[in-house]
Amino acid sequence: MQMELTAQRIKTHLEDLSKYTSTPGQGVTRFPFTKEARMASEYIMARMAEIGLKTYMDNSGSVIGRLEGQIPETVMIGSHLDSVRCGGAYDGIAGAVCGIEAVRAIVETGIKPYYSIEVVATNDEEGSRFKSGLFTGKVMDGQLSVDDIKRYRDEDGISVYDAMLEYGLDPDAIADNRRADVKAFIEVHIEQGPVLEAAKKDIGVVDVIVGIRRALVTVNGRADHIGTMPMNMRMDAVEAAAKVIANIGDRARKYPLAVATVGNLNVEPNILNIIPSKVTYSVDFRGTEQIHIDEQYQGMINDLDAVCSRFHMTYQIEETLNVAPVKLNDAFRSYIEESCHERGWSNMHIVSGAGHDAQVYGARMPAAMIFVPSVGGRSHCPEEYSEPRTLAMASATAFDTLLQICKEKQL
């Protein structure tokens, strides 16, 4: 692998892909099942085809390039194609591009790998449009039903089901797309935090990916006049929600490596002189221990019960995501370390505080993640950046790891 050429190709591809956004000049916004996703998918498939891969779009809307091996069982490498709103040009898509470069290097060796290898650019990992996420991994694992994809809707009321139809996919076959042939998963990703840069390390070897439990909470009050309704008779949805929300962060601080975040806060009727009748907010609990996540979730429910009872109000919770923490494969992590050692690159073990495709795959098969430093620790913003040099390093490490996996023949 020629590192300078690899770095230049990665840089060019990411610059080109950053143009497929619905918010030009304000970062990358590339939601699933949109024209921007379609254009980026076509670009990625063209790059896959250039190195001789068989390309196609699967029924989740992800794009795949396949290199046939000696046997049909498959090792998959890649990351996601979609983005958050007004995000960066590296989150997810850099991993898909690095996957192409790793497989390019295998093709150039002329070796037919033992396992077939697929590069994947997955769809709707972020959950930014439909408030769920990790879509491709769930589809490939057979976790989603037709009822599920009819239930998840975007802010315009469009369901995943209808969006898939419009995109030319078959939502009624969503439960028939489990990939039992995929035996391992490798993901290159930007760190999205400051740890590697602060430690002056080239590569992060991910030990564990945090679990995530996410929900939409609605607190129902009653709209009344703000001046004439006494305080002891009010059903103020904002006051009730605020009391619950105030405890969420404090509760998370009691647990090591746990975080909790409230966002996407909506108030109705959102008018100056009317007591709020409804508050809807998203909440996201993360941690390396499932029991810590669940205790925080239950603590919020207990608070909702108490506060809504006090104010004679009601609430609803819709759980939109619940994935357990995943410990990544020991052997694969050792392959990554060995590659770094042999190539003279510094590395360190790290925990991923972000959710990733690899955690869905890693729950049922050997999986690994390779992190590259994020400059300034910035991510999910237009300022997001990782150096092409370190992305090329990650591609080379992924290449070495894929070869080692194929050599072992023990998946």
Where do the protein language model's features map onto the residues?
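A short beta-alpha structural unit
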Residues: 32, 261-270, 282-284, 288-289, ...
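Catalytic-core environment of secreted peptidases
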Residues: 47, 51, 63-94
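Zn-dependent metallopeptidase/amidohydrolase metal-coordination segment
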Residues: 10-23, 75-79, 346-397
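His/Asp/Glu-rich mid-to-C-terminal helical/loop segments that flank catalytic regions of hydrolases
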Residues: 225, 229-254, 299, 372-411
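N-terminal capping segment at the start of a domain
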Residues: 2-34, 123, 380
